[in-house]
A protein has these predicted regions:
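Domain-level signature for proteins that mediate thiol-based redox and metal-cofactor handling
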Residues: 1-67
Length: 67
């Protein structure tokens, strides 16, 4: 699975639950909330003041290291 800024957080977490650590790290502690699960990575990063490209790169590097 490759993550993009348009990827929906709920979809990411359903397929790769270990990625929750990256969302927690940016202060997104409401991962179970329906609203946050429907947000794109880009939307969540905007709300939490985080660079979406950097977060996407971190998550994709993590996922690549698993394979």
């Amino acid at each position: 699975m490759e993550i993009t800024k348009q990827s929906i957080i709920g979809d990411i977490l359903d397929r790769e639950p270990e990625t929750a650590q990256f969302f927690f790290a940016i202060g997104m502690h409401c991962l179970g909330c329906p609203a946050s699960r429907g947000e794109s990575v880009e939307q969540a990063c905007a709300v939490h003041g985080t660079d979406a490209d950097a977060l996407v790169a971190q998550i994709n590097a993590f996922l690549a290291s698993k394979n």
